[in-house]
Every structure is written in C-alpha cells, then in structure tokens.
Amino acid sequence: MISRYVAENKTFEKQFLDGSLEVELNPQGTLAERIRAGGAGIPAFYTPTGVGTLVAEGKETKEFNGRIFILETALSADFAIVKAWKGDKAGNLIYRKTARNFNPMMATAGKITIAEVEELVEIGELDPDQVHTPGIFVQRIFQGENYEKRIERRTVI
C-alpha cells in the first residue's frame, strides 16, 4: 500500500502488523508528483521533501547546489479508478471541488481508467473549456447510483 495516510482501519492495522501488508508512506505532494510523473512517462525525479526522515531510508540521494535531494520513482497502475461530477460517453470528465486534486493525474497514470460519474451526458454536451480529463485517458465510464460519505472519526462536538 502506497499512501500518504492510512486512517484507523482495524483490518488494515492487523494486516500490517502480521506482515501480510506492506506500507510505504509518502508526503502528499511527493505522492501526487509520483503519480503525475507516472502519467507523463517521467521515470523518476528528485525532491528535498523527506530528507533526514524515515521517508528517505533506503532511497538514493544526491546533492544539488549544496542541498540534499531524494530520488523518487514514478507511480503508475494497471487500473485507475476515478470519480467525477459529470462525464460524457467519450470519457471526457469534469470534477467538482477537491475531486480536482488527485483525479485528473490518477486518470493519466492508469493503463485502464475507470470513471464513475454522477451525471453521464451525450457527446458534445460538455463545454470543452470545462473538461479536466480528456476522454483519451478514460477507457470505461458509468453513472453511479449511491453517494454515501461516511465520517471516519468525529472530531467536533
């Protein structure tokens, strides 16, 4: 599991502690850049984020202009699963709010991208200037039915 945060899932915790699940934590910006690089065909990049921490353990480092950087490799996947607000039957996608943070780059980093949309429209109904992910990156699209967002842990009274 490569993640920036793994929450408080008891099953996840048990699998990690018994050794059946491997975990690699990345700072959020580094994780985003690894995914973006994978989608762009860039094999690796250097970042100063994480130098001198557990994040850097076992990774190649290099000094540039007196500053140490960590070599991070790109991430890509066989499948990318994204959720968009609206999409057309050609796979063009529009995201809303924070869904614009990771979904567009995730779509580029998957060999096969599967998109769930709240509203599926005909080709030509989306304003091209509003499209965040072009259909070239989407191989499967469907309209979802249920959008329940559970609270992970209540932190306010």
Regions found by a protein language model. Give the residues of each.
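Conserved alpha/beta enzyme-core scaffold
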Residues: 1-157
